[in-house]
């Protein structure tokens, strides 16, 4: 996986968290930098850990699935991308549900619950990464840093932007995941030909 693909993956994986952060920022009277960075750290850590868990699960099964690994990566990334696009086009998403279920006071537990709700897809991406020649530590660090920056910015921008761009980030993230999955499949099939 190229460095550009890893960075794009990091930003694609952080779009759900960014949308949630915009919602949290919009719900706060006056978001402070301290609150925004705290949210970014919580989301970033969770978003960095979940692909590692998925990667470990994928590695455990990789010997049995090696002949189909490129199709699995393509299928998982494509399905997740399509899901994100559909959620972005609908009025409601997992992010909206997570926001509804969290209290108005955004304590650490509420942040962690929302962080886990928005990082389930990162675990599935981690499974697909187990079949690729990629250093999972680098990917996890990039995903965590992208999420940290996107969530911090999202909380601060939330008051001004609100619902205007929240859904569009999910759509963009979905398109990026589909493109990465398609690139993996293309590279494998063209290399095998």
From Swiss-Prot:
InterPro entries linked to this entry: Mntp/YtaF, Put_MntP
Keyword annotations of the record: Cell inner membrane, Cell membrane, Ion transport, Manganese, Membrane, Transmembrane, Transmembrane helix, Transport
Gene Ontology CC terms, in alphabetical order: plasma membrane
One GO molecular-function entry: manganese ion transmembrane transporter activity
Superkingdom of origin organism: Bacteria
Transmembrane segments: 3-23, 37-57, 66-86, 109-131, 146-166, 171-191
Membrane topology (UniProt): Multi-pass membrane protein
Location in the cell: Cell inner membrane
HAMAP family given in the database record: MntP_pump
Family: Belongs to the MntP (TC 9.B.29) family.
Protein name: Putative manganese efflux pump MntP
Organism: Xanthomonas campestris pv. campestris (strain B100)
Protein encoded by which gene: mntP
């Amino acid at each position: 996986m190229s460095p550009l693909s890893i960075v794009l993956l990091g930003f694609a994986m952080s779009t759900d968290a960014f949308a949630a952060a915009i919602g949290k920022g919009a719900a706060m009277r006056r978001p402070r930098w301290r609150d925004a960075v705290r949210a970014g750290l919580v989301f970033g850590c969770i978003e960095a850990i979940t692909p590692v868990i998925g990667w470990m699960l994928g590695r455990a099964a990789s010997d049995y699935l090696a002949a189909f690994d490129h199709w699995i990566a393509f299928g998982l990334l494509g399905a997740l991308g399509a899901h994100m696009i559909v959620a972005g086009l609908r009025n409601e998403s997992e992010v909206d549900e997570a926001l509804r279920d969290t209290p108005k006071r955004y304590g650490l537990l509420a942040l962690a619950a929302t962080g886990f709700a928005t990082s389930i897809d990162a675990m599935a991406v981690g499974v697909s990464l187990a079949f690729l020649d990629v250093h999972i530590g680098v990917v996890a660090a990039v995903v965590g840093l992208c999420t940290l920056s996107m969530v911090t910015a999202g909380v601060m921008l939330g008051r001004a932007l609100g619902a205007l761009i929240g859904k569009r980030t999910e759509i963009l993230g979905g398109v990026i995941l589909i493109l990465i999955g398609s690139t993996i499949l293309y590279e494998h099939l063209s290399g095998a030909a």
